[in-house]
Amino acid sequence: MVSKNTGHRCSFCGRSDKEVQLMITGIDGYICNECVERANEICQDALKTVSQSKLGLDLKTLPKPQDIKTFLDQYVIGQDEAKRYLSVAVYNHYKRLLQKTGDDEVELEKSNIIMVGATGTGKTLLARTIAKFLSVPFTIVDATVLTEAGYVGEDIESILTRLLQVADYDVKAAERGIVFIDEIDKIARKGDNPSITRDVSGEGVQQGLLKLLEGSVVNVPPQGGRKHPEQRMIPVDTKNILFICGGAFDGIERKIAQRLNTHVVGYHAVENTAKVDKDNMMQYIAPQDLKAFGLIPEIIGRMPILTYLNPLDRTALRNILTEPKNSITKQYIKLFEMDGVKLSFDDDVLEYVVDKAIEFKLGARGLRSIVEAIMMDVMFDLPSSKKKTFTVTLDYAKSQLEKANISRLQNS
């Protein structure tokens, strides 16, 4: 019951009903509207603290951007610019989750991320490594399988289904997770696609992604698949889910060049337009280039952090083979060690692998495919033999790669 001008005082703050707007009457006491508002704030902060403690989030222990980048350096070679952007973005995102309910009415907005870079430059690895560092639910989604409602393929909500599955259906944990949407460039708007069996232009999928990126409560089918009326749904609030999108955006260099009024090739190539580095046009990428490529403005606006990944040069590819904590060569050495065999690689073998990765234009992702082809026979035969050491020589590597289906690697 609400009372007014009865002479009653708030049992919490002692104010009379004449000093406040409302006085709520209970069985054995009274509470004013101001104490109700304050109690609501205390409850919200307490519930947020409980949820954060379950996920190990605390402002004092939250890794700083330099700590995040140092961890990334252990697993990802190069790409310092992208690492810095990601480290700051992730740090600010989780500070936002730790924000207390205050009176200043300053609400920190979510900053989703889009990474542009050629295949094999480390987009997926960066996102996966950050999720590993923070120990939060993480899932990778291929944008090419997503379709708008009514077409064959996966619904947009399947993204959240996968995140829920990774989080063991802990909704609170999933609502603070990270989603990496790969191949985001493949759903760019295209007007010349005649298909009638799926989303024709890609714009429908982009429109469907908007509600996830901006933050809204989405009803998710727990086991995935299409929705039907009698199915039980799980409501998931996406406002605190960090979305990282990645794509190769093949051909976007021409869009950048057009904007900079610089031709990439041709008789009209400009020698020097504001000292533009035409060998790495990606460093000049801007949101308007993504729009020209086919992403709708609403999608671009909900991914305010745009960063690029440089093409990997020979030195970077060589370091990827040996330097990271879980480098390719270290993984094979560990596998052989489990069989009691000491494995080693000659230096010229590693140079040969890099040569082939560059020749096939596979980037870092192709390094493993090449090494796997070289190592297949010895991994099959050695466990049954009594050998305790094995050295991969250049002649052996060449012979094994010639036996392998090289065209398959080149076309992968």
Residue ranges and their predicted role:
Residues 2-34, 41-78, 83-139, 143-152, ...:
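AAA+ P-loop NTPase nucleotide-binding core of proteostasis motors
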